[in-house]
């Protein structure tokens, strides 16, 4: 019998993703935190009235963090 350790990322009682590595689970959780903050920021803009689109855009930006940092000049190409 094998023992398998799984790390579950959960938000508001809902299972979002399961990982076998704690580092991967932590990275995903951090990305979700960033998406939550971006969602709040996008909501303040009133450019996107559809919350679903705000959520999709926030998730896209969080998933593409490195490219976003380059685009806004917070990080330089080496």
Provide a role label for each language-model segment:
Residues 24-33:
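Short active-site loop/helix that positions an aromatic residue
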Residues 33-54:
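Charged/polar low-complexity intrinsically disordered segments, enriched in acidic residues
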């Amino acid at each position: 019998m094998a023992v398998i350790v799984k790390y579950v990322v959960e938000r508001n009682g809902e299972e979002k993703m399961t990982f076998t590595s704690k580092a991967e689970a932590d990275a995903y959780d951090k990305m979700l935190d960033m998406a939550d903050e971006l969602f709040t920021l996008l909501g303040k803009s009133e450019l996107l009235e559809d919350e679903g689109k705000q959520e999709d855009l926030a998730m896209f930006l969080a998933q593409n963090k490195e490219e976003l940092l380059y685009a806004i000049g917070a990080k330089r190409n080496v």
